[in-house]
Amino acid sequence: MKQLTILGSTGSIGNSTLGVVRANPELFKITALVAGRNVHQMAQQCLEFAPRYAAMSDETSAKALRLILAENGSRTEVYSGEKAACELAAIDDVDQVMAAIVGVAGLPSTLAAIRAGKQVLLANKESLITCGKLFMDEVMHSRAQLLPIDSEHNAIFQSLPEKVQSQLGYSSLSDNGVSRIILTGSGGPLRETPLVQFADVTPDQACAHPNWSMGRKISVDSATMMNKGLEYIEARWLFNASAEQVEVILHPQSVIHSMVRYHDGSVLAQMGTPDMRTPIAHAMAYPMRVNSGVAPLDFCKIRELTFAEPDYQRYPCLKLAIDASNAGQAATTALNAANEISVMAFLDSRIRFTDIAVINRMVVEQLSLPEPASVDEVLVIDRKARDAAVQAIAKLNN
């Protein structure tokens, strides 16, 4: 039985992970749960899965959780803060760590799991977007095993040769017969919305994804295709791919989750019902296959599979991300930070949908920063970019 720590247990990925545990109680045991401030949901999770440890992001939330658990006779030990999250990511008894805390906030605990040599199920994009080289160097040094959770990267992983899977981030794609990785994206809920209407798009419209059930921030990223841009950056680090070896195409049905093209002309594609429990179950049980709780794909109900090139006028954030990837990690870190600020401002109705790309571009072009050589330097770039984004939003609103 595998012992599991979930970083970000109350989020979308965390809940899907618990769904896989629920479907396979004889295979997985929750040792620790880590979350932000959602005390009510964390209490429910602790009472159902009875972890030994739990941690909240602040002491106020931790106190509230302790009170609820004590009233219900739970023996779960509750801690708080970033240090606690890092310690729970590195517990000796834990086999796997689901790294699903969104944003740069998830970086320290994800690195703690890597340094402890754990099998890390990577759902935190920012680990590679902001610290790609540093992160992969830590993986090699600690001999931790990295398994991608994003549906696209997991699909690519499943379609790659075993040698590349076992040497993730360092194996040569070309030497193993791979010519190109093809990332698919649905195009989001605004794929057919006239461009003239983009300025009036509401947060609810941007979050109404046609295929996937996701959190609001990542739903907006899907609408702008920034999510695909960040996945492009992540894919280059995960699979040791050059810019020429990664391609992004639109696939509105979200049935093919990504593809790998080989030198001999073959293309291997991973397909399935769009449900995050599938890649999560694959990574949790790897190299075995277990019940994910997801309904099997019914090919007779699939009317068509269509593909198209992305339009950068419709998706300027995708182009920004590709350009940032070519520029380096200072640029990708700045872009990611600016995007987090601009998306939150949009969700709070403080800026228009079209302002997201404008702010992101302003920040990346404004900041000329050296390449980071440490995590601390990454965090400095992140902070400067966030400050610049806040200032850019203020200017737009004046």
From Swiss-Prot:
<feature type="binding site">
    <location>
        <position position="150"/>
    </location>
    <ligand>
        <name>Mn(2+)</name>
    </ligand>
</feature>
<feature type="binding site">
    <location>
        <position position="151"/>
    </location>
    <ligand>
        <name>1-deoxy-D-xylulose 5-phosphate</name>
    </ligand>
</feature>
<keyword id="KW-0479">Metal-binding</keyword>
<feature type="binding site">
    <location>
        <position position="152"/>
    </location>
    <ligand>
        <name>Mn(2+)</name>
    </ligand>
</feature>
<dbReference type="InterPro" id="IPR036291">
    <property type="entry name" value="NAD(P)-bd_dom_sf"/>
</dbReference>
<dbReference type="GO" id="GO:0051484">
    <property type="term" value="P:isopentenyl diphosphate biosynthetic process, methylerythritol 4-phosphate pathway involved in terpenoid biosynthetic process"/>
</dbReference>
<dbReference type="Pfam" id="PF13288">
    <property type="entry name" value="DXPR_C"/>
</dbReference>
<feature type="binding site">
    <location>
        <position position="36"/>
    </location>
    <ligand>
        <name>NADPH</name>
    </ligand>
</feature>
<dbReference type="Pfam" id="PF02670">
    <property type="entry name" value="DXP_reductoisom"/>
</dbReference>
<dbReference type="InterPro" id="IPR026877">
    <property type="entry name" value="DXPR_C"/>
</dbReference>
<feature type="binding site">
    <location>
        <position position="125"/>
    </location>
    <ligand>
        <name>1-deoxy-D-xylulose 5-phosphate</name>
    </ligand>
</feature>
<keyword id="KW-0464">Manganese</keyword>
<dbReference type="GO" id="GO:0070402">
    <property type="term" value="F:NADPH binding"/>
</dbReference>
<feature type="binding site">
    <location>
        <position position="215"/>
    </location>
    <ligand>
        <name>NADPH</name>
    </ligand>
</feature>
<feature type="binding site">
    <location>
        <position position="222"/>
    </location>
    <ligand>
        <name>1-deoxy-D-xylulose 5-phosphate</name>
    </ligand>
</feature>
<protein>
    <recommendedName>
        <fullName>1-deoxy-D-xylulose 5-phosphate reductoisomerase</fullName>
        <ecNumber>1.1.1.267</ecNumber>
    </recommendedName>
</protein>
<comment type="subunit">
    <text>Homodimer.</text>
</comment>
<dbReference type="InterPro" id="IPR013644">
    <property type="entry name" value="DXP_reductoisomerase_C"/>
</dbReference>
<dbReference type="Pfam" id="PF08436">
    <property type="entry name" value="DXP_redisom_C"/>
</dbReference>
<feature type="binding site">
    <location>
        <position position="228"/>
    </location>
    <ligand>
        <name>1-deoxy-D-xylulose 5-phosphate</name>
    </ligand>
</feature>
<feature type="binding site">
    <location>
        <position position="11"/>
    </location>
    <ligand>
        <name>NADPH</name>
    </ligand>
</feature>
<dbReference type="InterPro" id="IPR013512">
    <property type="entry name" value="DXP_reductoisomerase_N"/>
</dbReference>
<dbReference type="GO" id="GO:0030145">
    <property type="term" value="F:manganese ion binding"/>
</dbReference>
<feature type="binding site">
    <location>
        <position position="10"/>
    </location>
    <ligand>
        <name>NADPH</name>
    </ligand>
</feature>
<comment type="similarity">
    <text>Belongs to the DXR family.</text>
</comment>
<feature type="binding site">
    <location>
        <position position="124"/>
    </location>
    <ligand>
        <name>NADPH</name>
    </ligand>
</feature>
<comment type="function">
    <text>Catalyzes the NADPH-dependent rearrangement and reduction of 1-deoxy-D-xylulose-5-phosphate (DXP) to 2-C-methyl-D-erythritol 4-phosphate (MEP).</text>
</comment>
<keyword id="KW-0414">Isoprene biosynthesis</keyword>
<feature type="binding site">
    <location>
        <position position="231"/>
    </location>
    <ligand>
        <name>1-deoxy-D-xylulose 5-phosphate</name>
    </ligand>
</feature>
<keyword id="KW-0521">NADP</keyword>
<feature type="binding site">
    <location>
        <position position="231"/>
    </location>
    <ligand>
        <name>Mn(2+)</name>
    </ligand>
</feature>
<dbReference type="GO" id="GO:0030604">
    <property type="term" value="F:1-deoxy-D-xylulose-5-phosphate reductoisomerase activity"/>
</dbReference>
<dbReference type="InterPro" id="IPR036169">
    <property type="entry name" value="DXPR_C_sf"/>
</dbReference>
<feature type="binding site">
    <location>
        <position position="186"/>
    </location>
    <ligand>
        <name>1-deoxy-D-xylulose 5-phosphate</name>
    </ligand>
</feature>
<feature type="binding site">
    <location>
        <position position="227"/>
    </location>
    <ligand>
        <name>1-deoxy-D-xylulose 5-phosphate</name>
    </ligand>
</feature>
<feature type="binding site">
    <location>
        <position position="38"/>
    </location>
    <ligand>
        <name>NADPH</name>
    </ligand>
</feature>
<feature type="binding site">
    <location>
        <position position="12"/>
    </location>
    <ligand>
        <name>NADPH</name>
    </ligand>
</feature>
<dbReference type="InterPro" id="IPR003821">
    <property type="entry name" value="DXP_reductoisomerase"/>
</dbReference>
<keyword id="KW-0560">Oxidoreductase</keyword>
<feature type="binding site">
    <location>
        <position position="37"/>
    </location>
    <ligand>
        <name>NADPH</name>
    </ligand>
</feature>
<comment type="pathway">
    <text>Isoprenoid biosynthesis; isopentenyl diphosphate biosynthesis via DXP pathway; isopentenyl diphosphate from 1-deoxy-D-xylulose 5-phosphate: step 1/6.</text>
</comment>
<feature type="binding site">
    <location>
        <position position="152"/>
    </location>
    <ligand>
        <name>1-deoxy-D-xylulose 5-phosphate</name>
    </ligand>
</feature>
